[in-house]
Structures are given as C-alpha cells and as structure tokens.
C-alpha cells in the first residue's frame, strides 16, 4: 500500500503537490507530459527526493524521511545500469548482495529468477553480448531478487520495439501477479497499457489531474480532479 498525505516538493520553479492512496497489489500507469511530475512521484516514493511537507507511508510504515535502502521499494529505469565487466548472474546477484558473496540458497534464488525471466541460458554472458530486451530482463530480475513489495518503473521499455515491449510487459505483469507486487509504471505508451493496468493516473504541472479506474478490483471510483 502507498499513501501520500499532503506531500509537497519544490525544485526551482517546479512545485509538486499530492494526496494519493494506492492499495496493495494495484497496477498503476502514470502518464502526462514531460515535466508534469511523473518521475518526481517515483523519486519521492523511492527516497531519492524527500518531501518538504506531508508524509509518505509505504506498507503501513512512515517512510517520509528514510533512505532509499530502507524502503520496501525496487525501481527500474529506462537505462538498465548493468555493469559491463560483470556476468548476467553477477549483475542479477547485486540485487541480493553488493559483495556478490552468495550462499548456496541465494545462488539458487538467482537461478530461479533467471528462469522466470527467460535468462537461464545467459547467466555466464556479459551485458555486451545481450540484446536490448535481454538487458532489460537482467535489470528486472535484479529488482525482483531484492524481493520488495513495491515496484517502480520509469519508462523501462521505451527504447525497445513494439513487439519486445509487449513481451516484456506480459512478463512483468505475470511476475507482479505471482509475487503480489504493487506496481507503478511511468509510460508514454498509453494505448499499450490501457487494457492491462488497474488504474491510470495523469499528472499536469506537478499535480494529479485525473485518476481513472480501468479494472474495478479495488472498490474505487473514477475521479477527475
């Protein structure tokens, strides 16, 4: 569950203000023009930006001023941030331990997640040997290995072609269902997501201008603000 209560954040001439409640396991698409506040929302939830007013509650705990590593959140950006000198398995394992000194059980988890995202045959390869879609699978696997209940994605598949985007989105939604994750995804591909999300939120000028329930699984109503 995500609750933002009276959150305010300002940077230069930009002001972000928001009250927002997202139930656990809801899948939400965040849309709007560039500079509308979409990435600011993710940064506030992840802890890369701190609110100047208001509170941020994540899974029942106040995380308004906690550090990113303390939050029940994983985040995936468009840039997959893979280390080119590490193998696929090692890049994935960073989600468990930065030291890469894994126990036998942790190594088994890497194998399991690799299988879930279709990378079991690529674990010993370097990122330079992978396609764009495969690199994003590695980055997604690393997020899943962190085993956090909230997953944030900022334009994660926009650099991929439409077929690969559809494939990655199908995989993502399947894994979210299996792991019972709460998902927020920033996107410009509105048509590709509209039938697959539970909710769509539009931002304009640092404020939520519209919240539309696409699948009424959470007993909410459509709201235009």
UniProtKB/Swiss-Prot annotation:
GO MF, one example: ABC-type thiamine transporter activity
Annotated residues for binding of ATP: 32-39
Highest taxon listed in the record's lineage: Bacteria
Signal peptide: none
Membrane topology: Peripheral membrane protein
Residues annotated as domain ABC transporter: 2-225
InterPro entries given in the database record: AAA+_ATPase (IPR003593), ABC_SmlMolc_Importer (IPR050093), ABC_transporter-like_ATP-bd (IPR003439), ABC_transporter-like_CS (IPR017871), P-loop_NTPase (IPR027417), Thiamine_ABC_ThiQ (IPR005968)
Subcellular location: Cell inner membrane
SMART domains assigned to the protein according to its UniProt record, in alphabetical order: AAA (SM00382)
Catalytic activity: thiamine(out) + ATP + H2O = thiamine(in) + ADP + phosphate + H(+)
Enzyme Commission number(s): 7.6.2.15
Major subcellular site: membrane
Keywords, alphabetical: ATP-binding, Cell inner membrane, Cell membrane, Membrane, Nucleotide-binding, Translocase, Transport
Matches recorded under SUPFAM superfamilies: P-loop containing nucleoside triphosphate hydrolases (SSF52540)
GO cellular component terms, A-Z: plasma membrane
Known role: Part of the ABC transporter complex ThiBPQ involved in thiamine import. Responsible for energy coupling to the transport system.
Family recorded in the similarity comment: Belongs to the ABC transporter superfamily. Thiamine importer (TC 3.A.1.19.1) family.
Subunit structure of this chain's protein: The complex is composed of two ATP-binding proteins (ThiQ), two transmembrane proteins (ThiP) and a solute-binding protein (ThiB).
Name of this chain's protein: Thiamine import ATP-binding protein ThiQ
